[in-house]
């Protein structure tokens, strides 16, 4: 047994190293094409990244032993908040009137879903939405959770505030993808 084997064994039983990407919004819109007089409608996707992404968290770490090897694991409690704005949607060259705001998906990608210890929810514009497992073909990456939400408020050029709390465990490391125009991460840990 090598240290790599010990890390892999702990990762399979506890949870792997985590990379958190999001939240971000996916909006669908129809694309009409004409081919030999026949109209064909397909769906396009546009992704809206947050203007502000702030992550505050507490990591509780421990060391698990496998033979002579030690493997770091953690449990985290994260508060992710910020806001979205329709300004970036305007830059996408997609007609704002055809976007399907009422069936938008808010997405959060995770490396290892087994690390979630409770269902994820988000407060978005004073409404609470529960996430479902999987990305339903709407994510930047394939692993994660999503919620179908009504984002009609984005039509009105308003800021759309969000906040979510996540309890997530992992091993070895935790990473955050800096998707926001402004991204801030502040973690406290006992190691």
Positions of PLM-derived features:
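Alpha-helical transmembrane signal-anchor/signal-peptide segments
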Residues: 1-16
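Soluble non-transmembrane domains of integral membrane proteins
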Residues: 12-13, 26, 34-191
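Solvent-exposed, non-transmembrane helices and loops of integral membrane proteins
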Residues: 16-28
